[in-house]
Amino acid sequence: MPKFAPLAAAGLAALAFAAAASAETVLRYTEPSVNRGERAAAMNWFAAEVAKRTNGALKINFFWGGSLMDARSSLKGVGDRAAEMGSIVGSYTAREMLPYNVGDLPVGSSDVWVGLRAMYELATTSPDLKKAFDAANVVYLGNFTTTEIQLICKNKVLSKVEDFKGVKIRSAGFYGQVMESLGASVLRFSGTEANRALDAGTITCNHNYLYGMRILRDYEVAKDIIKLDWGQHLAWAVIVNKEVFNKLPADQRKALREAGSAMVDKVAELMISANDNALAAMKAGIGGHKVTVHEFPEAEKAKLLKAGEKFIAEWKAKTDAAGYSADRILAQYRALTEKYEAERKAKNYPWKR
């Protein structure tokens, strides 16, 4: 159940927004996660940038841990102005955010920065994505990522797609569907429960990310990392209420846009570093627990991508039926992925130039 009464909360938010407008404007930001880790650091950096770029005239006040509303309520809550800003997860708003959910399909780059920049440009230039955000009464400002999908397994090494058959794997989203189609027995529950499930033998492998394996201590109960480097979950956005955004002075709207774009690079920098550090630490050993890393062969990864085509077709059918052009979205997304991959190869990451 949502943690707010929409009309009452929207009224309170409007009063708070109006009262602050004479001196400084404070935007309430609903965030389901806690104020800890690399993504939270990027969000705090974003808020500081907004304040700096507006000389303190525009500020963001985070409400962490779902204290205003839960993750499933964020899109509607921000659209109804129960909070001025928030983070949304595309899989929780599959119907409303069909075009944006292209970022969760197993088609994009597994490079964190390339994926984030491609999604940012798509979300800020695609007429289809703009239509979806407009319908929700929100404006897109920036993007997050889970980073690339990996597996950590207990007494099991997967080296080809045939190895998925019969393996119990905790997974989610399109990636879980692909593994299921390959014969895996996919269980869907919170990643925070995976450690106990691995230890108990309820699952053999967990779909996770390198930094997540370290945080959740998967390495304590499972020793084999299958480095799939397979796509990312990129349908994860920063949004602001459209009416609130449009009423801000032009310089403040510009500051929000520019800080949102800059935050995309900051998220990439922090997440890539977190993954690198986590992998190095787990390989070296943490508290006596070491992992072995197994690179999934490129030829087999190509088969994974091929297996995902069925689910792309399903997304396309739903997206077209909802009045969008799935082919146009996919073509632009793929072109942007190629654009930023070429830039990365030519110039390296922005923070390394």
What are these regions (language model features)?
Residues 1-11:
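Bacterial N-terminal signal peptides that target proteins for export
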Residues 11, 24-116, 124, 128-353:
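N-terminal secretory/targeting leader peptides
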Residues 16-20:
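N-terminal signal peptide c-region/cleavage motif recognized by signal peptidases
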